[in-house]
UniProtKB/Swiss-Prot annotation:
<keyword id="KW-0547">Nucleotide-binding</keyword>
<dbReference type="GO" id="GO:0003723">
    <property type="term" value="F:RNA binding"/>
</dbReference>
<keyword id="KW-0347">Helicase</keyword>
<keyword id="KW-0690">Ribosome biogenesis</keyword>
<dbReference type="InterPro" id="IPR012541">
    <property type="entry name" value="DBP10_C"/>
</dbReference>
<feature type="region of interest" description="Disordered">
    <location>
        <begin position="337"/>
        <end position="366"/>
    </location>
</feature>
<dbReference type="InterPro" id="IPR011545">
    <property type="entry name" value="DEAD/DEAH_box_helicase_dom"/>
</dbReference>
<dbReference type="InterPro" id="IPR050079">
    <property type="entry name" value="DEAD_box_RNA_helicase"/>
</dbReference>
<dbReference type="InterPro" id="IPR014001">
    <property type="entry name" value="Helicase_ATP-bd"/>
</dbReference>
<dbReference type="GO" id="GO:0005829">
    <property type="term" value="C:cytosol"/>
</dbReference>
<protein>
    <recommendedName>
        <fullName>ATP-dependent RNA helicase DBP10</fullName>
        <ecNumber>3.6.4.13</ecNumber>
    </recommendedName>
</protein>
<comment type="function">
    <text>ATP-binding RNA helicase involved in the biogenesis of 60S ribosomal subunits and is required for the normal formation of 25S and 5.8S rRNAs.</text>
</comment>
<dbReference type="Pfam" id="PF08147">
    <property type="entry name" value="DBP10CT"/>
</dbReference>
<dbReference type="InterPro" id="IPR027417">
    <property type="entry name" value="P-loop_NTPase"/>
</dbReference>
<dbReference type="InterPro" id="IPR014014">
    <property type="entry name" value="RNA_helicase_DEAD_Q_motif"/>
</dbReference>
<feature type="compositionally biased region" description="Basic and acidic residues">
    <location>
        <begin position="748"/>
        <end position="762"/>
    </location>
</feature>
<keyword id="KW-0378">Hydrolase</keyword>
Length: 900
């Protein structure tokens, strides 16, 4: 058979078919993607038979042309959305799930999804630290749908997702419905406030996925005696909030009923100690997933620390907002644009600020202010709104919907300032943030890192401003040692400072702060509500100060010398351009006057004036006591300075030295005793080497990354509560309370174990040994089964019984046949005339129907569909029984017996 020559003409669609002989990934993707028509590529025509004279040269030209085409494709695809190698396609998901992910709008997995999904598909327990908005919901929903695949005909649920609130559970259900659209998986929502009977029906329909709050799910577990042995996949969403809201007892009881072969996932914004203990008890060799960006301070973040007095703290905050950050007062640009859009739009909006807010983003003035308690949040919000700022606020006990609205306003740029507590800000993720203000200085360096980690992201610069009182100085020194940066007080250095690499401390300009302090004093005198909020905030701060973590002993010793130094009250170098030399001298004089302490007590003054009100030996005792205190103070101050000088601390903590130099330094020290141990036989309690690689090699675990205990030790961070409840600032001080019924003091434990009386307060021990409410077993499920005529529910592993239920609403729709007159149109709407014509037409149809003789038969036919008029055997039996009872009651003979 003779060979055919290659046709010099291009294909019908002007595509060179010779490329198909050398199929590559780029060529196939180019075929699938519609593109513009191009000219025939004459350089790519291939001589298949090799009849050409330049065989080797042709191959080289062909290869070069292919490479040029590939480079051209890559350059043309820049800036377009393409399927990347690191996308969801590389995770090994099925086609239906990939289609649902694409329909949802996800193209590339987020960092938490990229790290979590492969581990979950590998059947490993995971503890993920992720904030709200980081894509954590899809991180556990996508592998769950991939593993469950389709509905199981065997009875028993296979996945359980526990959420702290109803709103979060609804969001999770929405994501599960959207991503599981291509499957026949059944999912149910079990939250408080819904009908128990409906939830009995949902559970009887054999759902695959249960999304619930812990309280209601435990109620159903006890009431229905649920067997959870079929559950393979458990998720604790927002686990830190689960523990904060008091669900620890319910979680322990639920965890006890789950099989040991389950896979458990735990997602949290922070990692408290109680959560670490729960994870160690309930998870099997968990892996901690933590994004590095959340644990480090950005090198682009610049820090400023301002020393203030307690009475000037509000004025200092107003000065920072007005003069340093320069936040404008009044309505924001985003709010003005939203109002303009509402004004020019034809349809009336329910909310003025939500018309086009999703296109906005935080501005360069966006600032988060961190406070200690929820009372400080209310107090500062009132002050700042009175000052004219656009403010949002959030704290732990704020309603979920209100919190979402407030945070969304800040994200959209409608407000410039967000006042929050550490507990409320734990799961908030702001994409672009310029400034962070620590109104109350954090008690742990980790909390400081957690706060300021929200700014200076993605290569952008940011600022953090902290207000430091004298009582906060030890915590500031702890932070300085934690960061390993030198401490600079005031303007002592006299050189250009780098605020990103140094801890620079100084005061604010006194005259400017005084103006805002006077304004605050006037406001407190005029506004009674703000004055009351201030008193409540002071009381809350006292409780907070009692329960916050204490600073290290060395920092407490060093803090006294730092506060008493002259540089402590010097103006911060940030205000170098504002104050002149004369102003600096004025500041020094005011600082000396402010720190003045009299040398004599009232006893010496009275003795010098010749007063005889006190015995003469009182002044001698006072003199001796004062001299002794002075000697003690001088000795302690000298001892403190010798133990912890600035240079020694910088050398020790910022720049660690090798063991050889330390040994030389120690041998030259005169106060150290000589060591008599023999190095050949002596075994020290400290490791001989500091090699991290050597420690990993000797370790019995597979690696430090998989060792949850070691990883969680670094990530653990306890946040103090933001309100004075028993779960917020610690246990109540008194362990007794007054019982009105018994007329005596009783132990508070009675409130916890249910022994204070009343059936509603009784507690019983569950399967795990913890006490749960006795009202969980009320018999309503038995009554529901009796009403539905269900003898026995199928057991786990048996085939599901048909007709038990259809799961969540969404099956057969109810058809409403009720005819209702249209509403009276609103005169102020733009479509008033249109609605008015509709109303008149409806009235005309109703009038015609009333005078139409055929409409009655039609109406009768419609109503006859609802209820049959034929009586059943049971109806006839009941009617006869009622008639017989009526006869006996009346005691009259029948009409037939009258004629006899």
């Amino acid at each position: 058979m003779p060979h055919r020559d290659v046709s010099p003409a291009a294909s019908e669609n002007e595509f060179d078919i010779s490329n198909l002989l050398f199929k590559g990934q780029d060529d196939l993707s180019d075929l699938e993607r519609p593109s513009k028509k191009r000219k025939p590529q004459e350089t790519l025509i291939l001589d298949v038979m090799g009849d050409g004279d330049d065989g080797a040269d042709g191959d080289e030209e062909f290869i070069a042309a292919q490479q040029t085409a590939a480079n051209r494709k890559a350059s043309n695809l820049r800036g377009r959305t393409v399927k990347k190698g690191g996308g969801f396609q590389s995770l090994g998901l099925n086609a239906a799930l990939l289609k649902a992910i694409t329909r949802k709008g996800f193209s590339v997995p987020t960092p938490i999804q990229r790290k979590t999904i492969p581990l979950v598909l590998d059947d490993q327990d995971v503890v993920g630290m992720a904030r709200t908005g980081s894509g954590k919901t899809a991180a556990f929903v996508i592998p769950m749908i991939e593993k469950l695949k389709s509905h199981s005909a065997k009875f028993g649920s296979r996945a359980l997702i526990l959420s702290p609130s109803r709103e979060l559970a609804l969001q999770t259900l929405k994501v599960v419905k959207e991503l599981g659209r291509g499957t026949d998986l059944k999912s149910v929502l079990l939250v408080g406030g819904d009908s128990l009977e409906e939830q009995f029906e949902y559970m009887a329909s054999n759902p695959d996925i249960i999304i619930a709050t812990p309280g209601r799910f435990l109620h159903l577990k006890v009431e229905m005696s649920l067997d959870l042995s079929s559950i393979r996949y458990v998720v604790f969403d927002e686990a830190d909030r689960l523990f904060e809201m008091g669900f620890a007892t319910q979680l322990t009881e639920i965890l006890h009923g789950l099989p040991s072969s389950r896979q458990t996932l735990l997602f949290s914004a922070t990692l408290p100690k109680s959560l670490v203990e729960f994870a160690r008890a309930g998870l099997q060799e968990p892996i901690l997933i933590r994004l590095d960006a959340e644990s480090k301070i950005s090198p682009d973040l610049q820090n400023a620390f301002f020393t203030v007095k307690s009475s000037e703290k509000e004025g200092a905050l107003l000065h920072v907002l007005h003069e340093v950050i320069k936040i404008p007062t009044g309505e924001t640009e985003a709010l003005k644009r939203a109002k303009e859009e509402v004004k020019h739009s034809k349809k009336r909006k329910r909310s003025e600020v939500t018309s086009n807010s999703h296109k906005e983003s935080p501005t360069e003035h966006s600032t988060i202010i961190f406070t200690a308690t929820k009372h400080h949040v209310d107090y500062l919000t009132s002050i700042l709104r009175t000052s004219g700022f656009a403010v949002s606020y959030a704290y732990g006990s704020l309603d979920q919907t209100a919190r979402k609205i407030e945070v969304q306003n800040f994200r959209d740029g409608i407000t410039h300032i967000l006042v929050v507590t550490d507990v409320a800000a734990r799961g908030i993720d702001i994409p672009i943030l310029s400034n962070v203000i620590n109104y109350d200085f954090p008690s742990q360096p980790k909390i400081f890192v957690h706060r300021v980690g929200r700014t200076a992201r993605a290569g952008k610069t940011g600022w953090s401003y902290s207000l430091i009182r004298e009582s906060d100085t030890p915590y500031l020194l702890d932070l300085q040692l934690f960061l390993g940066r030198p401490l600079i007080l005031g303007r002592g250095s006299g050189q250009q400072l780098n605020y990103a690499e140094n801890v620079v401390v100084g005061s604010l300009p006194r005259d400017k702060v005084a103006r805002y302090t006077e304004w605050m004093t006037k406001l407190l005198d005029e506004d009674v509500d703000i004055e009351l909020q201030r008193e409540v905030a002071i009381k809350g701060e006292k409780l907070y100060m009692r329960t916050r973590n204490s600073a290290s002993g060395e920092s407490a010793k060093r803090a006294k010398a730092v506060v008493e130094s002259a540089e402590w009250m010097m103006v911060h170098p940030l205000f170098n351009d504002e104050s002149s030399r004369l102003e600096e001298q004025r500041e020094k004089m005011l600082a000396r006057v402010g720190g003045y302490k009299p040398q004599e007590t009232i006893f010496e003054i009275s003795g010098r004036r010749g007063a005889n009100h006190h015995p003469p030996d009182d002044s001698d005792d006072a003199n001796e006591l004062r001299d002794f205190d002075g000697e003690n103070d001088n000795a302690i101050a000298a001892d403190n300075m010798s133990l912890a000088s600035d240079s020694e601390l910088e050398v020790t903590f910022s720049y660690p030295q090798s063991g050889k130099s330390n040994s030389k330094k120690d041998t030259n020290h005169p106060n150290l005793r000589e060591s008599f141990h023999n190095p050949e036989y002596f075994m020290s309690y400290t490791p001989a080497s500091n090699s991290l690689a050597e420690d990993r090699a000797y370790g019995v675990h597979s690696g430090s990354n998989t060792n949850f205990v070691e990883s969680s030790r670094i990530a653990t961070m306890d946040l103090a509560g933001d309100e004075s409840t028993s779960r917020g600032f610690g246990e109540p001080r008194s362990i007794m309370r007054w019982d009105k019924r018994q007329k005596k003091y009783v132990s508070r434990r009675n409130d916890e174990d249910g022994s204070k009386g009343g059936k509603s307060d009784l507690l019983v021990r569950g399967e795990s040994g913890v006490k749960i409410a006795a009202s969980f077993r009320s018999g309503r499920f038995d009554a529901w089964k009796k009403g539905k005529r269900i003898g026995r529910m199928p057991r786990v592993g048996e085939a599901e019984a048909p007709g038990l239920g259809s799961g969540m609403p969404g099956g057969k729709k109810y058809r409403h046949r009720k005819e209702q007159a249209p509403k009276t149109p609103d005169k102020f709407r733009g479509d008033y005339e249109k609605k008015k014509k509709k109303l008149e037409a409806a009235k005309q149809r109703e009038t015609e129907k009333a005078f139409d003789p055929s409409s009655g038969a039609k109406k009768a036919a419609v109503t006859s569909r609802g209820k049959s008029e034929l009586k059943t055997v049971e109806d006839i039996r009941k009617a006869r029984k009622v008639k017989e009872l009526r006869k006996q009651k009346n005691a009259r003979p029948s009409k037939k017996g009258k004629g006899r």
